[in-house]
């Protein structure tokens, strides 16, 4: 890659989720041969973000869970501390340096870090950043229906983001910077977007929860969390046909193909 373009995987922490729900219709008799779970049959998931330095822009994909979970939810999800600020510091940046945040969707493990609690005050984690969200995703997160109500519980955070004027809604494909583009695919959520990286000497895609881990590369392996398994399957097929490296959102062993 050219000097002005840099891509850095960022670890925002770890949490655990039900293995059966994550791996969908893949039979346990198959996956348990190679995939480890804890005593509650939970998979350990890393919260993988991507930091992209594209000339004068410093773009972060997703924000992780954040630091606002109560003790009960921390126990349920076996959540570590919010590692994102420290992970950014380890590569020479701070939250204030981020110019853009791309949110693949607004579930808690990807959008929980939009707002952080600092000294008892709720404030934007990335106050200088424009936050890019698909219009369909924003609308369902702001006023979720009965099917989606349990998945979206950050209305206060979203209101603060809107109030501070740091929100940009897009509809479909949109060019974020010279080398970074978002594309709405749906599937996992109604307004889910993937991020395509089009660099001069290579291309890649951040598939997010469409392909969260290496086992999800197999087309039939689709989690039970999808709002539309059919759309997720179509998105997976399209991504694989691109024949470019795929960054995973939750694999604990590898960052990409």
Regions found by a protein language model. Give the residues of each.
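Metal-dependent catalytic neighborhoods of phosphoester/phosphodiester hydrolases
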Residues: 74, 112-121, 257
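Conserved beta-strand hairpin/beta-sheet module of binuclear metal-dependent hydrolase folds
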Residues: 5, 14-90, 194-209
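Residue-level marker for buried hydrophobic side chains located in beta-strands
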Residues: 59-61, 102, 131, 204-206, ...
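Metallo-beta-lactamase
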Residues: 66, 79-93, 97-109, 125-184, 229-244, ...
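Active-site glycine- and acidic-residue-rich loops that bind
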Residues: 111-115, 183-193
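Short, P/G- and charge-enriched loop/turn segments at secondary-structure junctions
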Residues: 35-40, 119-120, 182
